[in-house]
Amino acid sequence: MAKIIGIDLGTTNSCVAVMEGDKPKVIENSEGHRTTPSIVAFTDDNEILVGQSAKRQSVTNPEKTLFAIKRLIGRRFDDPIVQKDIKMVPYKIMKADNGDAWVRVKDQDKAPPQISAEVLRKMKKTAEDYLGEEVKEAVITVPAYFNDSQRQATKDAGRIAGLEVKRIINEPTAAALAYGMDKKRGDSVIAVYDLGGGTFDISIIEIAEVDGEHQFEVLATNGDTFLGGEDFDLALIEYLASEFKKDTGIDLHNDPLALQRLKEAAEKAKIELSSAQQTDVNLPYITADASGPKHLNIKLTRAKLESLVEKLVERTIEPCKTALKDAGLTVSQINEVILVGGQTRMPLVQKTVEEFFGKEPRKDVNPDEAVAVGAAIQAAVLSGEVKDILLLDVTPLSLGIETMGGVMTKLIEKNTTIPTKATQVFSTADDNQTAVTVHVLQGEREQASANKSLGRFDLRDIPPAPRGVPQIEVTFDIDANGILNVSAKDKATGKAQSIVIKASSGLSEEEVAAMVKDAQSHAEEDKKFKEMAELRNQADSLIHSCEKSMKDLADELSEDEKKGIETAISELKEAVQGTDKARIEDKLKVLTDASAKMAERIYAKKSSEGQTAQGQTQSQESTKPAEEGVVDAEFEEVKEEDKK
């Protein structure tokens, strides 16, 4: 049976894992790393680079190197948070026709799910190379606080990458699975504090033994989908840029190349300061003006970095308080605290978490890999490989509809266990009203307009009647992925209307299908590109070995042999310069055959010479006098008592 893989699609890094027997295995990518940078680059010769190779060239190709795309997924261009990011990234974020935030690369507009799909394809390929078989299904993780639009967009990314997304699960829940899989100590309540590259989540999860099953029940979740390591980097970039401007009067924000170098240096300094007390940020030739080149050299202490990001760390505490309140628990009732996400390696974060929860967080969970491991465990549960685990997740935000006076009426409260279904009867607001618009909302505010609009649809042909008489039954149905279906039915006529919520933004079926097709054509191009590269390498290797053999064996070859091989080499060299695969293969075969004949003849010659020489040696040895090689020696007898 084909494996279902688990993918942690992160803002900064991504990771893929699979269950092998009863143990999850994190798979190394082609570069030998267990995590892959979530970076996609488009080169001038139309190659798409993903991961480490994209990151390596980011400084020389800043406007076509896309990072932290997960921060844009499922978001509107006019969102203040997106507007803030526009000023801080070297690539171009633009407004799509549907109002979403997209990116522009090489005069082409691309949706965030398209870019994320490239990262997912890399994860898929990593798993396929390891497993030796095609992978078609995956469990993909998302921040617990992702709304419906963001979950839909992540599912779309999976489809574009050629994966059937069997389940979308929340990152903290996945981390809890990874932690609790082999813990059999009875019931416990854990807090998963997940501060990743772009998002923050806190989940309170109860792990219990119920009828022999390991049950993971999410009691409450909260968070901030625009708070993470990238914001810590941005705070440091702002500080470095402002210090440089003070010294030189030059604003580095206007220079994409300088900004990209600054980003790399900030990230490196931040990581170094998790173990060191101070570091130097040294960027020679960062920019230039009329007076000549300018260099950036700033000494940075851990204390300074902590003062820059203190408010960001403090922002994580309020969601922790809310999650505990929603779970009906106090800090003292939390048995263990687990840290997930690379940013939790920062000493200030660890100290803040320890102070809030009153206990030291556990150190036996790998913050970079736990989420992918949990996704792989859930994948094995879905495929039937693992049978004694039950996962009960929740919807992070309340869901409802807009009712009279612009009020949001909630049908499903936040932190309700999913899957779930809720039905409520509404009526008309005016006499003889023949249609109602069902406006679906997600959020916690009483005012409808202050919440996230997930979509709207009309229920028509309601028989005319005084206001308040018609009975309109509205049903909300959330599946295990946290994705919503809404239906409305006129109880008098039985007329019904339903939609799977596709946000008023988001990608249409046609757009997703077109992107799937585009990704497939790219996959075909990539395959051809790889085949040609391998063929050229094979040809170069053969040319080199033939030229070396001809040089070493010049005296052994006839003029005809030399000429034949030289011609074959020359024709193969010419073919390699072109793009005709069949011609390269043909010329490769000609040279292979010619070199094989040369090798065969020389081997036969050497072999016969060797046999002749061996025969002569044997005959010489047989004529040697028998005494030769015999040596006279004196020896002394050792008596038994002398041995002791």
From Swiss-Prot:
It comes from Legionella pneumophila (strain Lens). This is Chaperone protein DnaK. Belongs to the heat shock protein 70 family. Keywords: ATP-binding, Chaperone, Nucleotide-binding, Phosphoprotein, Stress response. Pfam families: HSP70. Residues 602-644 are annotated as: Disordered. Induction: By stress conditions e.g. heat shock. PROSITE patterns: HSP70_1 (PS00297), HSP70_2 (PS00329), HSP70_3 (PS01036).
